[in-house]
């Protein structure tokens, strides 16, 4: 995979994480009355048309009997109209707006005003005024759009298919008439066997050529994985043949036995491959973390873990791939003294309850919290500035769990060897500046 592909995959993963986080926050929000507006505009729709609809809704809301609810709804509609004014046309992927007033856990009212362009086209139009935000259309954006190739091959022919999400597509079918194992007429057994093997060889070559035609674009595979299926040993022979494209051989994730050929075999192959299809991301995650562990086992010096060393690697431009547990709870604080002096500290959910960490030891002055942000979000917003790609991982695999428990859920693969111990001799930050204490994950 090229560096461009790596970057595109990293960017897509980060956008998915941002949407996932947004959905979580929106679903937790609740309001009084029906003052929470969910507005989703499809690509190609007209801003003027949506403005007209909001103006009509404003007129209707003016008749709400409850004064408190009426003012809340009118305020939310006005906020949505103001957000809409920021756009002269609907963005290429559509527009999602959430406006309203939510009630915090402390019972206080907090305004919510969000407008985003999704990372891929959203095919839903929605306007709802409720006591909650409606996020189902955003959730649909997170459904996998990975494509998987299927080759169903037996002695009667081959089918080339594609599966993307829940959509199956038959790309091409061929039929073949191979001689049976027994001879006919006066043909010698040896000559007949040679003829049969030649036709079989040509058949495998034809299927291999078509596989490259359908599943390779611009010299690289266009599918995330490839499944070979069939009722005889053709599928195994195809996958091991020298005629089968090496680039596609590396993409084979499963070989399955099916009772039929053609469309019925395609459907059966999809059913039998369900588990491996759902675990492709899981497999990619295991591979990435295993690579991280391998660097450590070989003591290459081309790895980092923990907040302090990872931030140093980023500052040096040495980090190639940043690996972050998506549920890491560490918070990044930007603090400022009345004198103007600033510093950054990182605290977990227990450490931030200690008021002493927000007080300067020398002067006794209290720090002002200028910025408070989950470190995961900070990485998502800033990883590009350091020339790194960002990979989110879970703790659901054995490797992922070990990465979170043993390495704090944060690490990286480096472009070149870095001696962090030597760097620390020259640069000893304040102990709070990169607070790298163990956390309860």
Swiss-Prot record:
The keyword Protein biosynthesis applies. One of its GO terms (cellular component) is cytosol. SMART domains: eRF1_1. Pfam families: eRF1_1, eRF1_2, eRF1_3. Its main location: cytoplasm. Keywords: Cytoplasm, Protein biosynthesis. GO terms for molecular function: sequence-specific mRNA binding; translation release factor activity, codon specific. InterPro entries: eFR1_2_sf, eRF1_1_Pelota, eRF1_1_sf, eRF1_2, eRF1_3, Peptide_chain-rel_eRF1/aRF1, Ribosomal_eL30-like_sf. GO terms for biological process: cytoplasmic translational termination. It is found in: Cytoplasm. Directs the termination of nascent peptide synthesis (translation) in response to the termination codons UAA, UAG and UGA. Heterodimer of two subunits, one of which binds GTP. PANTHER family: PEPTIDE CHAIN RELEASE FACTOR SUBUNIT 1. This is Eukaryotic peptide chain release factor subunit 1. It comes from Dictyostelium discoideum (Social amoeba). The gene is erf1.
């Amino acid at each position: 995979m090229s560096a461009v592909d790596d970057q595109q995959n990293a960017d897509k993963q980060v956008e998915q994480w941002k949407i996932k986080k947004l959905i979580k926050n929106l679903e937790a929000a609740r309001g009084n009355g029906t003052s929470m507006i969910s507005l989703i505009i499809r690509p190609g729709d007209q801003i003027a048309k949506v403005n007209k609809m909001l103006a009509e809704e404003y007129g209707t809301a003016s008749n709400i009997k409850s004064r408190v609810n009426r003012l809340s709804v009118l305020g939310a509609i006005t906020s949505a109209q103001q957000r809409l004014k920021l756009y002269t046309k609907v963005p290429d992927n559509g527009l999602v707006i959430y406006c309203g007033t939510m009630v915090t856990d402390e019972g206080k009212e907090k305004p919510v005003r969000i407008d985003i362009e999704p990372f891929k086209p959203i095919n839903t139009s929605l306007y709802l005024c409720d006591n909650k935000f409606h996020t189902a259309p955003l959730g649909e954006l997170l459904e996998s759009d990975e494509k998987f190739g299927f080759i169903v091959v037996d002695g009667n022919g081959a089918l080339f298919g594609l599966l993307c999400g829940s959509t199956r597509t038959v790309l091409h079918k061929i039929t073949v008439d191979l001689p049976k194992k027994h001879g006919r007429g006066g043909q010698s057994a040896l000559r007949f066997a040679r003829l049969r093997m030649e036709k079989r060889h040509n058949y495998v070559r034809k299927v291999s050529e078509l596989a490259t035609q359908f599943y390779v674009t611009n010299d690289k595979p266009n599918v995330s994985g490839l499944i070979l299926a069939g009722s005889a040993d053709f599928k195994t022979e195809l996958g091991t043949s020298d005629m089968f494209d090496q680039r596609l051989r590396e993409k084979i994730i499963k070989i399955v036995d099916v009772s039929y050929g053609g469309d019925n075999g395609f459907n059966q192959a999809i059913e039998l491959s369900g588990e491996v299809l759902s675990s492709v991301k899981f497999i990619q995650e295991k591979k990435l973390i295993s690579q991280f562990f391998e660097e450590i086992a070989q003591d290459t010096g081309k790895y980092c873990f923990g907040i302090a060393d990872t931030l140093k690697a980023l500052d040096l431009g040495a980090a190639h791939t940043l690996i972050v547990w998506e549920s890491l709870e560490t918070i990044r604080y930007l603090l400022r003294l009345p004198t103007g002096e600033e510093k950054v500290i990182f605290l977990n959910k227990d450490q931030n309850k200690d008021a002493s960490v927000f007080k300067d030891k020398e002067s006794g002055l209290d720090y002002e919290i200028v910025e408070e942000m989950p470190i995961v979000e900070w990485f998502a917003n800033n990883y590009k500035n350091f020339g790194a790609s960002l990979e989110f991982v879970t703790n659901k695999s054995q490797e992922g769990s070990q990465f979170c428990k043993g390495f704090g859920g944060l690490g990286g693969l480096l472009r070149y060897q870095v001696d962090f111990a030597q760097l620390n001799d020259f640069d000893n930050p304040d102990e709070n500046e990169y607070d790298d204490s163990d956390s309860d994950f």
